[in-house]
Amino acid sequence: MGFEKYYEAFPAYTDVYSEEYRKRIEALEPLLMKHMPAGGRVLDLACGTGGFSFLLEDLGFNVVALDNSDVMLSKAREFAKDRGSKVEFVKGDARKLPFEENSFDYVVFIDSLVHFEPMDLNSTFKEVARVLKPSGRFILQFTDLRALLPVLMNGQIVGTEYWISRVLPDTDEKTVVLEFQSEKEHFRVRFNVWGKTAVELLAKLYFRQLHSERMNEHSYFQVYAPKK
């Protein structure tokens, strides 16, 4: 029940030239420009195929992008070659970042919380605080999956071929299994369930919140400063 099949079924989520990716970039670009004055070194954490890494590079940043998936990094490097990009793509563990202390002006963490269990996210936030400069900023964007669950239970259509046929939360709703159905097949994926309150409580162990705003009904954009 990993994400490999999920990204295979929904290729628009990993194709930086797709309409879906373009919409995500258009929604976030004004916020990134507002809260990230141009210039400096940025870590794009859990970068996937690099769509936001390339955006940040276009905005004038020196970008290092990290992911633990060989498949995602291979695609990212193909896109980078096609674009003539100088983004440095690194394979690594977000829980133990391969970078020195105080080495980044910004760390961005975009729409990746579903991949992280509570202990993993705690370690990741701690590492982000370590690698950020004292004057640095942590940019966090996430979907409140806990609030979204009732919507998903109504058989939400996903993409052009699939719909969610079953929603199976565990007893304490820390994870949920979503069953995706099409005319040809079905498959299941397990997501970690993060709500806004839980994210903020964990982040405040290591950061001071400077800004928070709702992007849409279930999505949030937040800015934090390290407690240094």
PLM segments and residue spans:
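A short acidic, Gly/Pro-enriched loop at the edge of an enzyme's catalytic core
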Residues: R95, F99-Y106
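Core SAM-dependent methyltransferase catalytic element
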Residues: Y206-R208, E213-K228
